[in-house]
Amino acid sequence: MDAIVKNFPLLDDTSGRPTQKEAEEAVRVLLRWAGEDPTREGLKDTPARVIKSYREIFGGYDLVAEDVLGRTFEEVSGYDDIVLEKDVPFYSHCEHHMVPIIGKAHVAYLPNGRVLGLSKIARVVDIYARRLQTQEAMTAQIARAIDETLAPRGVAVMIEAEHLCMAMRGIKKHGSTTLTTTFTGAFKTEPAEQARFMTLLRGFK
């Protein structure tokens, strides 16, 4: 799983990213390929709208999770037990077909002297969701970012998601859910901690 995370390439502004005009022209090409006339009234502004929406949908490429996680807090009153953020909703896109992945993430960690603001976990999920993804890679990336930045005693991440590439095309199995997990530290080495994480998730259902 580490290889998945380490080999995840990102473009920077100097690596030949197309201009806004070039991106809009690419949308026009796709419209023509689909059999449409991109100059007709209803589609004239579609290329600009698509690129504007893609800038938001794929905005995670311009954000760094470690920057979001950089500010931590000393534990309040000596709290050192599990911190669990459950049912964090997200929308992502499959890197194979560029269609939506709709799901929720459950993220837990065992503090080791420092804690995160609760919103930081949701923001990290959002950063990785707003990229072309596989669910396996996204699960590992969230866990790794928290583990390396916070250095907790352990991190647990579970993602449940529906992949519209399975619902809209191909085998067309609407409603099927994919579940992935990544565990580090005590959650990986101590079965009791992993079981407690799973029990807490079931208890909140």
From Swiss-Prot:
What keywords sit in the KW lines? GTP-binding, Hydrolase, Metal-binding, Nucleotide-binding, One-carbon metabolism, Zinc
- GO terms assigned for molecular function: GTP binding; GTP cyclohydrolase I activity; zinc ion binding
Q: Return the EC number.
A: 3.5.4.16
Task: Read off the InterPro entries from this record.
Answer: GTP-CH-I_C/QueF (IPR043133), GTP-CH-I_N (IPR043134), GTP_CycHdrlase_I (IPR001474), GTP_CycHdrlase_I_CS (IPR018234), GTP_CycHdrlase_I_dom (IPR020602)
Annotated residues that bind Zn(2+) are located at C94, H97, C165
Q: Which domain of life is it from?
A: Bacteria
Which pathway is this protein engaged in?
Cofactor biosynthesis; 7,8-dihydroneopterin triphosphate biosynthesis; 7,8-dihydroneopterin triphosphate from GTP: step 1/1
Q: Which reaction does it catalyse?
A: GTP + H2O = 7,8-dihydroneopterin 3'-triphosphate + formate + H(+)
Record's GO cellular component, any one? cytoplasm
PROSITE patterns to which the protein is assigned, alphabetical = GTP_CYCLOHYDROL_1_1, GTP_CYCLOHYDROL_1_2
GO biological-process terms attached to the record? one-carbon metabolic process; tetrahydrobiopterin biosynthetic process; tetrahydrofolate biosynthetic process
UniProt similarity note: Belongs to the GTP cyclohydrolase I family.
Subunit structure and binding partners: Homomer.
* Protein name in UniProt: GTP cyclohydrolase 1
Q: Which organism is it from?
A: Sinorhizobium fredii (strain NBRC 101917 / NGR234)
Taxonomic lineage is: Bacteria, Pseudomonadati, Pseudomonadota, Alphaproteobacteria, Hyphomicrobiales
